[in-house]
């Protein structure tokens, strides 16, 4: 349905769309494409590389850079988490361009964790507050209406949405583990050294228990 407008969306991101609300929308659309249809994203990247007369890797690097740079345009926690999931989906990779942007991807991921994680005061562990469980039934007080069919449909849709179905914490852990296995311990450590030590410390706190 959105296919005809995607080149325009891609161009808007690369050229740094100046209106924050529009840029936020563009990044949200591209995040969903990247996360949920990788093969289509690859063909779009190939098409845009021809239009921009650039190598695909170079264009991908430019897109990630602009994404990281304009992350503050995204004000909703859902959008922050979507961006983190989308960029993390590029890992594991031995592509030098993606490795070059690894620091930015981790920065966005940790920012995303700050937006969506809540601490359990009893256990001191963190959990992703955006996750919706199949089993969870909202508690209805006497003053509230029970959920309507539309509410139930909304929940079923939400359960198919990675933002509500995938734990950002778990996703980061699995992607970093896969990257470590791909590069080996030494290569992975070199990559982690490109990330600010404060960000690494925050990441370790969020991933306690994994």
Locate each region found by the language model:
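Alpha-solenoid helical-repeat scaffold
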Residues: 1-210
């Amino acid at each position: 349905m959105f296919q005809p407008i995607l080149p325009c969306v891609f161009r808007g991101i690369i050229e740094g769309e100046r209106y924050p609300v529009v840029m936020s929308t563009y990044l949200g659309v591209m995040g969903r494409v990247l996360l949920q249809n990788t093969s289509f994203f690859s063909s779009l990247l190939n098409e845009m590389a021809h239009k921009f007369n650039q190598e695909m890797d170079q264009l991908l690097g430019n897109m990630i850079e602009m994404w990281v740079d304009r992350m503050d345009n995204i004000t909703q926690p859902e959008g922050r988490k979507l961006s983190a999931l989308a960029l993390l989906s590029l890992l594991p990779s031995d592509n030098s361009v993606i490795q070059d942007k690894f620091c930015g991807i981790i920065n966005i991921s940790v920012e995303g964790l700050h937006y969506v994680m809540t601490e359990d005061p009893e256990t001191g562990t963190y959990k992703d507050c955006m996750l919706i469980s199949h089993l969870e039934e909202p508690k209805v007080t006497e003053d509230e209406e029970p959920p309507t069919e539309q509410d139930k449909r909304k929940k079923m849709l939400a359960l198919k949405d990675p933002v509500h179905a995938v734990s950002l914490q778990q996703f980061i852990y699995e992607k970093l583990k896969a990257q470590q296995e791909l590069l080996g311990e030494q290569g992975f450590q070199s990559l982690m050294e490109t990330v600010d030590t404060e960000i690494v410390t925050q990441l370790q706190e969020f991933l306690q228990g994994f």
